[in-house]
Curated annotation (Swiss-Prot):
This is 1-deoxy-D-xylulose 5-phosphate reductoisomerase. The keyword Manganese applies. It is an enzyme of class 1 (oxidoreductase). The keyword Protein biosynthesis does not apply. It comes from Anaplasma marginale (strain Florida). It holds the Pfam family DXPR_C. Its cofactor is Mg(2+); Mn(2+). Belongs to the DXR family. Its EC number is 1.1.1.267. HAMAP family: DXP_reductoisom. GO terms for molecular function: 1-deoxy-D-xylulose-5-phosphate reductoisomerase activity; manganese ion binding; NADPH binding. Catalyzes the NADPH-dependent rearrangement and reduction of 1-deoxy-D-xylulose-5-phosphate (DXP) to 2-C-methyl-D-erythritol 4-phosphate (MEP). 1-deoxy-D-xylulose 5-phosphate binds at residues 128, 154-155, 177, 200, 213, 218-219, 222.
C-alpha cells in the first residue's frame, strides 16, 4: 500500500492486454489509486464498463465512430466522455501523478509528449514505439521536466529495477522467448498464417505485438528502447533466447558478477511495479517456483531464420539513427497490418522492413513533429513496397 494518499492515475489503452492488467490492479487497490481518465481505441462497451467500475472522471475513445455508443453507455453517470485525437490529448493534459501508456504503435508518441509537458510525475510506459521513434528527443524532454519513465516491458522493467541498485554495468542482456516459430525451419515459415503467428506459447499479447514476437522484430525494437532508456551503447546490449521467459534481463558488472531479475511470465508483475513506483507494492503477485520448471534454457538467436532481430542494431549504428529507427518502426507496422489482412506472406515482413530501411534511413530528424512527418512518409513508401508483392497462394 502507498500510505501516502491516493495516487491519481490515467490509463491509455485500457482495453488492451496491458491496459486490462492495469485496470485489474486499480480495481483491486481502490485505497491506493484514483482513476482520472481511461482511453481506448474503439471498444466502447468494455471502456464504459471499466469507467463505471473504477469511477473514472473521464473516458475517451480514439475512434470517433465509437463516440455515440460510449456516450449512450455512460449516460446518467458523472463520467466525462471524449473522442478522437482531441479527446486523447485532452486526457493526456489532465492533472495526474502517473499515467499508464499502453496504446499500440507510434500513435502513443504525441500523447506521451503531452503527458510530459502536463507535469505528470511518472509514466508507466508499455509502448516501445514512442521511444523508438522519439529517441533522445523524448528522453531529453522527460529529463528536462523531471518526468520519470518507468518501463512496463518485462525486460526493460527488469533492467530498470536492476540498475536502481547499481547502474555501473558493463553489459545488459535482454531475453527473448523466441516466439511460436522458435524451432520452425525457414521452409515451414513460408506457410505461416496469421492465426499461427498469434499463438504465442508463453505470453498473452495483442495482435500486433504477437506478430512482432513471431518475427523477433519486437526484440529489435526493444534493443533500441534499451539504448535510449538506459543510455546503453549498442555494443553493450546482448539478446539471448530463453523460451521459458523466467529470466527477463541480466546485467553484467565489471567485477565479473551478474545480476538478473526473475519472475513468472506475467505482465501484471511489471505493471504492478510501474504503477506503485517509487514505492514498493506490498500486494501479492504470482510467486516463482523454480523447481517446477526443472531447467531453464538459453541459446543464441538464429539471425538466418530471424533476420529482423538484427535490424535494431543496424538502425542504431546507421549514419542517421533517428531516421533509421522511424523507418524500421513504420515499415514494420505497415507490414504487420498487411500480413494480418492476408495481403502479404509472413516471411515478406522482414524483407519489406529491410527494403524500407535501405531506401528511407537517410535524412535528419530534429524534432518530434519531424518524427511524425517522417513516419507518414515511411508508411506511404512501405505501402508502395507491399503493393508490389503478390499474396502467397496458401493465404488465398
Amino acid at each position: 500500500m502507498l500510505h501516502m494518499g491516493r495516487k491519481r492515475v490515467s490509463v491509455f489503452g485500457s482495453t488492451g492486454c496491458i491496459g486490462q492488467k492495469a485496470v485489474q490492479i486499480l480495481r483491486d487497490n481502490p485505497d491506493d489509486f484514483e482513476v482520472v481518465a481511461l482511453v481506448a481505441k474503439q471498444d466502447a462497451h468494455l471502456l464504459a464498463s471499466q469507467a463505471r467500475l473504477l469511477s473514472a472522471n473521464m473516458a475517451v475513445v480514439a475512434e470517433d465512430a465509437a463516440y455515440e455508443t460510449l456516450r449512450e453507455l455512460l449516460r446518467g453517470t458523472c463520467v466525462e466522455v471524449g473522442a478522437g485525437t482531441a479527446g486523447v490529448m485532452d486526457a493526456a493534459s489532465r492533472d495526474v501523478d502517473s499515467a499508464v501508456m499502453a496504446i499500440t504503435g507510434i500513435a502513443a508518441l504525441h500523447p506521451v509528449i503531452r503527458l510530459i509537458k502536463s507535469g505528470v510525475k511518472s509514466i508507466a510506459l508499455a509502448n516501445k514505439e514512442s521511444v523508438v521513434c522519439g529517441g533522445e528527443l523524448l528522453i531529453n524532454a522527460a529529463k528536462q521536466t523531471g518526468v520519470n519513465i518507468v518501463p512496463v516491458d518485462s525486460e526493460h522493467n527488469a533492467v530498470f529495477q536492476i540498475l536502481a541498485h547499481d547502474g555501473c554495468v558493463a553489459r545488459v542482456t535482454l531475453t527473448a522467448s523466441g516466439g511460436p516459430f522458435l524451432r520452425w525451419t525457414r521452409e515451414q515459415m513460408q506457410a505461416v498464417t496469421p492465426s499461427d503467428a498469434l499463438a504465442h506459447p508463453v505470453w498473452k499479447m495483442g495482435r500486433k505485438i504477437s506478430v512482432d514476437s513471431a518475427t523477433m522484430v519486437n526484440k529489435a525494437l526493444e534493443v533500441i528502447e534499451a539504448h535510449y532508456l538506459f543510455s546503453l551503447d549498442p555494443d553493450s546490449i546482448d539478446v539471448t533466447v530463453h523460451p521459458e521467459s523466467v529470466v527477463h534481463a541480466v546485467a553484467a558488472y565489471p567485477n565479473g558478477t551478474s545480476i538478473s531479475l526473475m519472475s513468472v511470465p506475467d505482465m501484471g508483475i511489471p505493471t504492478l511495479h510501474a504503477l506503485y513506483w517509487p514505492q514498493s507494492a506490498t500486494v501479492c503477485g504470482s510467486t516463482l517456483d523454480l523447481a517446477s520448471y526443472g531447467k531453464l534454457t538459453f541459446m543464441e538467436p538464429d539471425l538466418e531464420r530471424f533476420p529482423a532481430l538484427g535490424f535494431g542494431f543496424e538502425a542504431l549504428r546507421s549514419s542517421k539513427p533517428r531516421a533509421a529507427c522511424i523507418a524500421l518502426n513504420a515499415a514494420n507496422e505497415v507490414a504487420v497490418e498487411a500480413f494480418l489482412n492476408f495481403e502479404i506472406a509472413f516471411l515478406d515482413i522482414p524483407n519489406i522492413i529491410m527494403s524500407a530501411m535501405d531506401k528511407l534511413a537517410c535524412c535528419e530528424v530534429n524534432s518530434i513533429s519531424e518524427a511524425g512527418e517522417y513516419d507518414l512518409i515511411c508508411r506511404a513508401r512501405t505501402r508502395e513496397i507491399c503493393d508490389t508483392l503478390k499474396v502467397s497462394e496458401f493465404i488465398r
